[in-house]
Amino acid sequence: RDVERSRGLGDVYKRQGITRESVRAALEEHPEACEVIITSPTYEGVVSDIKGIAEETHRFGAVLIVDEAHGAHFNFHDKFPESAVKCGADAVIQSIHKTLPSFTQTALLHLNGNLIDKDRVKKYWNIYQSTSPSYILMAGISRCLTFLEDDMCDSVSLGYMDEYVFRLTNLRKEIKKLKYIKLQEVDDISKIVLVVNDGKNLYDKLLNDYGIQLEMAS
């Protein structure tokens, strides 16, 4: 990951996702590689060039596996980045409980194309999964997907994701008006990344004075 540190209101980090050029260079250096595994989006909402990376990976005869744990919501609104599921990745793992209305521990594995042996995946899935799966969690996954599908089909009222994006857009506009807090622009608008002189101090103040729980501070 290329990181550039500039001076200003604290340290402002400009992060770029993984590029197709960096993947091509890595595969040229290691032509024996049979798979490429990347995380996109990052925890901070930085998205890599999945389409370009998929093209390079397949050109070298390898498969692309994307950890899209924090991007399960991408498919459900055009204001979010395009999901790796639609960008040519061969396998995509999504933790739907992170950004969608589902129980903790729920996740999905998407397999695309024919480069990955689906029967082999099922074989090892059966070996490593619990012999006593939680039907509550599985029902939660089903209910989550049904809810989102119905939400997208509702053309009359403002849907769940429409309202979510509306609130995100307004929040980001208001944050940009602040004098001592900078909003770091990232690919995923649902990630509110704030840049201040003392992140821990802001974390504690929002939690103790306003009851707002941030995910992390650095």
Regions found by a protein language model. Name each.
Residues 14-73:
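Active-site phosphate-binding strand-loop segment of PLP-dependent enzymes
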Residues 58, 85-86, 207-208:
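Anion (oxyanion) recognition and catalysis
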Residues 2-13:
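Single conserved hydrophobic/aromatic residue that forms the stacking wall/gate
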